[in-house]
């Protein structure tokens, strides 16, 4: 039974129910990135709505970046897909959605947000709703934090003690889910406000974190969950052969009197991820016993293990423009807990002795099958014999039993076209000021900054109809490794085909990227979501293949 009382503009909601009764079932999506040039984005949003309809949700939320850029027709498309899938207006679920930065790229914040609200039918920029006895408050990107502060205070006044308050944001609170350690990934003002509301359950987007990532749920002073993305996912923080892959994430939330159950889905086929073990949040919230706080996860989350008989085989790739070979091996036990593989390389010298050469880490892009295959470029590996230790690592940094092997690297037929480039660095993703290095060649930078690629090599690549290969050493002082490295064009759009980072030490890594310029515009290497610090570039080389 639901009770709703209105007092002085504050909605007082309460629910009387048994422990086994679902009080509210709602869906969550984010980062649709609808784009008129990419019809596949339409399909993924439609599939999410169809999933919500199949599971008979009462309500759903969309956490922003609905369009890839300011495209009013994409706001209209969102509304049309919603109306088509939920064709019966009498049973159509309500929704709460907020605009975000991509929704206004190409116009002003005011124009972008105004058209978003008008054409999607969201009602307002920062909607507040009470659905079946539960408060939902929201704040759109770039809106004043005081809006969140006031709406949370009102919701807390209108909710019984211990009842969850759902908070919808685009940027996650800082230092919660993956990708939120810097100002370009997480919001410190949200975090400061939410620390005072242990009953808050935050649902956010922005970082394109996969829902299969077990770190997408976090508990500390409150609970935070990343809603994933319906567009693409970047491999934040770890080098990988595959830059990005398409994403089909949606979740369905079931709220009970004593818990919240979060079920994760792939909208492409409607299948639930890990149906035997959905995320469960006990109610009311208790920080010490919260199952998804880092201390409990480090202690209880399983570690992937290779068995003693695991054999890793090397297969050369003789006719590939970007890869010199693959490593093939059986998936480890407890593969669901697997986040990445760490490959430690040793190189054989002329005396036949092996010495430490460096480390490569590979993110797992999808649920592991019976066999795994890792493939990568050779721009930083000289022709030689190598041996390796391959270790599975879980989402919280714990390593399992490693496997070992050897391989030989052949010479890659690349043609070097430039090796005397002096770094030209600007702040920002596509705009910003030119940065000046200090006497030792270090650039002081925070968050996003970019290394401009020489225009003559772009022209040469287009003229010769060759792919362009870039190899760059990056040294960091006073900062963690850059979270993401991407090649972007003059408009700031990511164009990299393939890349990998080779970590030679805690401070230095070699980055190799392969891409094909499409026109004679400006291109840059974007260092994205990095921590503030000093960066120096060295061993910069360009090749054609």
What are these regions, as identified by a protein language model?
Residues 244, 251-362, 366-372, 393-421:
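A short C-terminal boundary segment appended to hydrolase-like catalytic domains
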Residues 28-30, 59-65, 93-101, 139-140, ...:
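Active-site neighborhood of phospho(di)ester-bond hydrolases with catalytic His/Asp-centered motifs
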Residues 22, 158-204, 211-217:
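Active-site-proximal segments of metal-dependent phosphoesterases and phosphodiesterases across multiple
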Residues 379-398:
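Beta-strand-rich modules
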Residues 71-161, 188-195, 212-256, 260:
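Extended active-site neighborhood of metal-dependent phosphoesterases/phosphodiesterases
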Residues 17-75:
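N-terminal active-site segment of His-dependent metallophosphoesterases
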Residues 10-18:
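Hydrophobic h-region of N-terminal signal peptides that target proteins for export
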Residues 412-545:
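Extracellular and organelle-lumenal recognition/adhesion modules and their flexible linkers in secreted
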């Amino acid at each position: 039974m639901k009770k709703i009382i209105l007092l002085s503009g504050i909605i007082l909601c309460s629910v009387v129910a048994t422990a086994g009764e679902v009080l509210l079932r709602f869906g969550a999506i984010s980062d649709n990135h609808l784009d008129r040039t990419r019809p596949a984005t339409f399909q993924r949003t439609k599939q999410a709505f169809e999933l919500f309809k199949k599971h008979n949700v009462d309500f759903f939320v969309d956490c922003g970046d609905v369009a890839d850029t300011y495209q009013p027709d994409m706001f209209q498309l969102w509304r049309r897909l919603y109306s088509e899938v939920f064709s019966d207006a009498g049973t159509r679920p309500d929704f709460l959605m907020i605009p975000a930065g991509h929704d206004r790229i190409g116009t002003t914040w005011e124009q972008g947000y105004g058209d978003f609200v008008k054409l999607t039918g969201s009602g307002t920029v920062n909607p507040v709703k009470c659905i079946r006895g539960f408060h939902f408050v929201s704040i759109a990107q770039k809106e004043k934090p005081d809006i969140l502060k006031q709406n949370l205070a009102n919701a807390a006044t209108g909710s019984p003690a211990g009842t969850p308050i759902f908070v919808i944001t685009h940027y996650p609170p800082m230092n919660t889910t993956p990708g939120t350690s810097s100002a370009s990934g997480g919001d410190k003002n949200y975090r400061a406000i939410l620390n005072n509301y242990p009953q808050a359950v935050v649902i956010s987007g922005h970082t394109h974190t996969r829902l299969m990532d077990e770190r997408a749920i976090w508990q500390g002073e409150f609970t935070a969950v990343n809603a994933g993305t319906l567009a693409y996912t970047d491999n934040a923080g770890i080098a990988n052969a595959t830059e990005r892959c398409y994403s089909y994430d949606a979740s369905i939330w079931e709220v009970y009197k004593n818990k919240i159950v979060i079920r994760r889905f792939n909208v492409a086929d409607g299948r639930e991820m890990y149906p035997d073990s959905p995320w469960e949040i006990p109610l009311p919230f208790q920080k010490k016993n919260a199952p998804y706080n880092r201390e409990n996860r480090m202690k209880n989350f399983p570690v992937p293990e290779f068995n003693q008989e695991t054999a890793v085989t090397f297969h050369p790739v003789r006719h590939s423009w970007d890869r010199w070979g693959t490593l093939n091996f059986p998936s480890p036990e407890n593969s669901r807990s697997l986040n990445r593989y760490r490959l430690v390389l040793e190189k054989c010298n002329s005396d036949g002795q092996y010495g430490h050469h460096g480390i490569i880490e590979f993110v797992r892009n999808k649920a592991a099958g019976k066999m795994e295959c890792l493939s990568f470029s050779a721009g930083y590996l000289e022709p030689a014999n190598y041996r390796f230790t391959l270790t599975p690592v879980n989402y919280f940094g714990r390593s399992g039993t490693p496997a070992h092997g050897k391989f030989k690297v052949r010479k890659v037929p690349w043609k070097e076209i430039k090796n005397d480039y002096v770094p030209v660095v600007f702040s920002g993703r596509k705009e910003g000021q030119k940065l000046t290095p200090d006497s030792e060649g270090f650039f002081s930078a925070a968050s996003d900054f970019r290394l401009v690629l020489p225009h003559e090599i772009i022209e040469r690549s287009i003229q010769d109809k060759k792919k362009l290969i870039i190899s760059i050493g990056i040294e960091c002082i006073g900062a963690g490794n850059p979270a993401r490295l991407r090649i972007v064009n003059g408009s700031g759009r990511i164009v990299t085909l393939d890349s990998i980072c080779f970590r030679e030490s805690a401070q230095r890594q070699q980055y190799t990227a392969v891409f094909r310029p499409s026109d004679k515009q400006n291109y840059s290497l974007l260092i994205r979501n990095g921590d503030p610090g000093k960066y120096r570039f060295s061993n910069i080389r360009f090749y054609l293949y």
